[in-house]
Structures are given as structure tokens and as C-alpha cells.
Amino acid sequence: MKRVQGFKGSRGQTPLFILIILIGILINLQNAESFNIPEKFEYELTWTGVKAGTATLEITRTGNDIKIFSTAQSANWVSVFYTVDDRVEAVLTKKSSLMFVGEPVNYRLRIREGRHRRDKEVIFNSGNKVTYIDHINNEKQNFDVPSLIFDPLSSFYYLRTLKLVVGEPVYITMFDSKKVWNVEVQVLRKEKVTLPTGTVDTILIKPLMKSEGIFYKKGDIYIWLTDDEKRIPVKLQTKVAIGSINALLVGGRY
């Protein structure tokens, strides 16, 4: 067997390639901790300018178990003619300090939006396989998937760790609706967004993917993230069956 000799720097100096590797590790560590855990966002939902409900997005950690929750509820006056009661949960496991958040373990989506009902679950198994369960229609199927794949909820947290440059799309592999998607996320431009706490610099993104939940989307989805290392989602806008829904960050802990 041929022995490969290592590179040696001058005495007392660190070889350049080692410095490059160390810098890369530090960058990865910074990205992995780019947002806080626990973290919770609270949103006010408006429909054509009128308050229509509330939504939350939360992530917690106990040991190596990571849990992400997303909820949306319609206001009382909206529920009279269109009830919204959505809850999405994702469970991940932390296996390496250099991982963005963790590897998906379980994903459960339960939504009620008017007459639209969904209760489905995805179990991420070993060996690059997932089990899809439709709890309403009593359906269960197994699928082969790539090794690095996310559910719709954990994919958003992965997105927040990526470098976002205007005009340069990023891609995320995701399992949803019994299919593997290579989702393109367009990075559109930088904008200022006014919140109850003041004006913040943001970067506007547009995922080219229509997932279920959060007022059953009918059109494009736009998300405004703070233009800093935390990438806090401060605003969301999407078309629905009638009109559009805006979600604006109004509280939480982050």
C-alpha cells in the first residue's frame, strides 16, 4: 500500500489547508447556532387588511430531541363561516454538534380549514425509507428517499441556516404529499419591514412549493426573513381561496 505523506508547514506555523478546514468548521458551527432554542414566534393573521386569526411557530429541545410546532387559529368572527384550526409537529434528533438542527424522525400534520381536513403523518425510518400514514383515509405506504431529506416544517429551519444571496436560488430536498421534492427557494431582494417594535432589514424569499396547511394556500408564498444571522421570519404573505393572508410577527421569545 502506498503511503500518502502529509503536508508540513514551516516550523511553528499551521499549514494553510488546516486553517481552511478550521475556518469551515467554525462557519458550520456558527450556522448551526444561528437561531436560539427554545424559540417562539407569535403572529397576527390579517385577511385583506382585517384581523383574521393568530399563528405560532416554536422550537424546543430536550436532550437530543428537537420538537417544532406550528399552529394557526381563526378569529371568532371568521370561524362563523370558515373555521381554521391547524397544528403541525415535527420531531428531530440531534446526532452531531455540526448538524443544522437535527435529523427528521416524525412529522404530523392536522389541519381543519373550512371543509378541508387533513391528518397525515410521516415516519422517517433507517435505511433511507419513510412511512406515510393518512389517518383519515386509513392509508399507509412506504417510500424510498434520499439520505438528506426534510419534512415541510424542518426544511424551513434548515433554510434559515443557509447563506442567502439575492438572485441565487437555494434548493432543499423534501418529502411531502407522498413525493420527494427538490424545492427551489428564490431569494428575491432586500426590503424594510415595519413591525410593532420598529423597522427591520429583511431578505425576501419565495419557495416554489405549495404545501398544505396555514390557510390552504392557492398562490405564491412570500416570506420576509431578518437580514442577519438569525433569519427571523417576520412576515409571510400568501394567496388563499378568496383574497390573501398576511402574517406579521407581533411577539414571542427569540
Listing of model-derived features with the role each one plays in the protein:
Residues 2-10:
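Intrinsically disordered, low-complexity proline-rich regions
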Residues 16-28:
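Bacterial N-terminal signal peptides
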Residues 27-30, 100, 148:
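Exposed, low-complexity/repetitive linear segments and helix-based recognition motifs
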Residues 33-126, 161-254:
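Acidic, serine/threonine-rich low-complexity disordered tracts
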Residues 116-160:
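Hydrophobic, well-structured mid-protein blocks that either form specific transmembrane helices
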